[in-house]
Amino acid sequence: MKKRTIATGLVTLLSIVTLAACSKTNQNSKIATMKGDTITVADFYNEVKNSTASKQAVLSLLVSKVFEKQYGDKVSDKEVTKAYNEAAKYYGDSFSSALASRGYTKEDYKKQIRSEKLIEYAVKEEAKKEITDASYKSAYKDYKPEVTAQVIQLDSEDKAKSVLEEAKADGADFAKIAKDNTKGDKTEYSFDSGSTNLPSQVLSAALNLDKDGVSDVIKASDSTTYKPVYYIVKITKKTDKNADWKAYKKRLKEIIVSQKLNDSNFRNAVIGKAFKKANVKIKDKAFSEILSQYAAASGSGSSGSTTTTTAASSAATTAADDQTTAAETTAAE
């Protein structure tokens, strides 16, 4: 299931690094004084600039500025507000405290969302350029068409086993059993092999069932609490796979692009390409290695950190996907 992360915010650090990297005059500004000594902005900057968090903060600031300049007109305020409202709805009354605990204001979080959406736009556009007939055919081989299913979700394995026995009994009314026992209100789902509306274990097991087939108990993990969750699935609608991949061309394209979005190497390459176009240069030796992963991914031959794009995209903006930090929301996009 797709997620938006309220990343462990580097907003305060971003402000600090920006403040500390100002002109020499400002660097001499006093932060604190004491008998016989002072602490200046420059003192503070020199103290914090070598930390991993500071490097991530500078990297995030670079990503935000570069992508805003190159793709700023591609993401509307309406899109950002929609994603923000979905996150707020997910968290409910605890949303403000979730933001505050990570050093965010509401506007900070909207900026995070915007930066991530700018990156997503760029990655999608680059991914579309690379799609060939060979790409479609490869995706088609693994593709399983959409099915419709009745789904029972339970928190207890013992309860799941008991419900399964009832569901597999002769003449059982699976729809009623699902309605009476499932956690939550929804019992009917439609999905294919590229869907994210159910855990991957459930999708895999369900898509291998025949029409009217009932699964065994499928164990998965709750994406927010990480506690075990148990599923029972019955397929109510299933069609044979068309022999012509072109029948699924639109859906295959969506799946290919989605896979690229989740490919950290591809994302790094797109970010690296944007940095190159912007002629980004690092002037402070303390931050000399922060672009290495993007240079390597974009084919410049540089070697460097294998840190995922979370530092750049999610910390600047998710992690989501997902990612991930302790605070997440299933704000679907």
Curated annotation (Swiss-Prot):
Region (Disordered): 296-333
EC number: 5.2.1.8
Molecular function via GO: peptidyl-prolyl cis-trans isomerase activity
Residue ranges constituting the PpiC domain according to the UniProt record: 144-237
Lipidation (N-palmitoyl cysteine): 22
Class of enzymatic activity (EC top level): isomerase
Catalytic activity: [protein]-peptidylproline (omega=180) = [protein]-peptidylproline (omega=0)
One GO-annotated biological process of the protein: protein folding
Membrane topology field: Lipid-anchor
Keyword presence, Lipoprotein: yes
Keyword Transcription: no
Pfam families the record matches: Rotamase_2 (PF13145)
GO cellular component, one term: plasma membrane
Keywords: Cell membrane, Isomerase, Lipoprotein, Membrane, Palmitate, Rotamase, Signal
Signal peptide: 1-21
Compartment list: Cell membrane
Known role: Plays a major role in protein secretion by helping the post-translocational extracellular folding of several secreted proteins.
Family label: Belongs to the PrsA family.
Protein's name in the database: Foldase protein PrsA
Native species: Streptococcus mutans serotype c (strain ATCC 700610 / UA159)
